[in-house]
Amino acid sequence: LMYAAYLSQMIGLDDIDPSVSAFLTSLYVVFTAIISSAYNLRLPTKIMLIGVSLATFGAGFIQGPPHLTWGLAEFITVFCAILFALHILFTQHITQRRDPVSVSTTSFIVVTICAAATVFIVGEGGDSGQWNLIFSDGVLLPVILLGVGGSFFCLLFLNLFQRYLHPIQAAIIYALEPVWATMYGLGLGMVDFSIWILIGGGALFIGNIIVEFFSTIENPALIQEE
């Protein structure tokens, strides 16, 4: 699921703006709520719905209003959001029954093998120039750090602690990702500041605060649900 989700996201990004991709991908918060509710035959609480709405709005608009026109790339990105939602739900299910470290290691190995196979089957894995680029100065180390730190250890922490959260809570927390990316981009001068950063980031932050502080008050057994 993780491999297919990231692959479809990259394919979609080839033909749409990053802001549109961010908005459509953020729909995984909504899909997580829908699928979880359908599976449990129970509607989310009002607090959860408010948190989902704020998180989806914030993640989608932190880079400004998306200029959305529906095409193949947009539908592929929506499919990516569904896959991310399923990944969150299946992670919740399996890590409550299996060792999270083993699950993380297996997932990382499977994704690595699938990604490597994709490079050679449909990419330019046979082009020596591409490999020379990867092993050139200033490229290899960031690639390794992103793979080990940005992927494996993030996946490990996700699997270790997500089992203690309701899937919708987890999805809303994950939606904070564009906030950190935007802050990092601002620090490096890669992103221009706009009022939408405050609006989108604020909506995400408020959505998380509302869910974390009020969901257990409204339903004390919430985090015990699967």
Name each model-derived stretch.
Residues 9-11, 28-50, 179-199:
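C-terminal transmembrane-helix exit sites in multi-pass transporters
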Residues 11-28, 72-83, 137-148, 202:
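Structural signature of hydrophobic alpha-helical transmembrane segments
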Residues 1-25, 59-62, 147-165:
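Specific transmembrane alpha-helical segments of multi-pass solute transporters/efflux pumps
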Residues 2-3, 7, 29-34, 82-85, ...:
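Hydrophobic/small/kink-forming positions within alpha-helical transmembrane segments
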Residues 44-64, 80-84, 115, 195-215:
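Hydrophobic transmembrane alpha-helices of multi-pass small-molecule transport proteins
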Residues 47-54, 72-79, 90-91, 95-148, ...:
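Hydrophobic alpha-helical transmembrane segments of multi-pass integral membrane proteins
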Residues 139-141, 149, 175-226:
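C-terminal-most transmembrane helix of multi-pass membrane proteins
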Residues 11-16, 41, 63-72, 190:
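Membrane-interface helix caps and helix-loop-helix hairpins in membrane proteins
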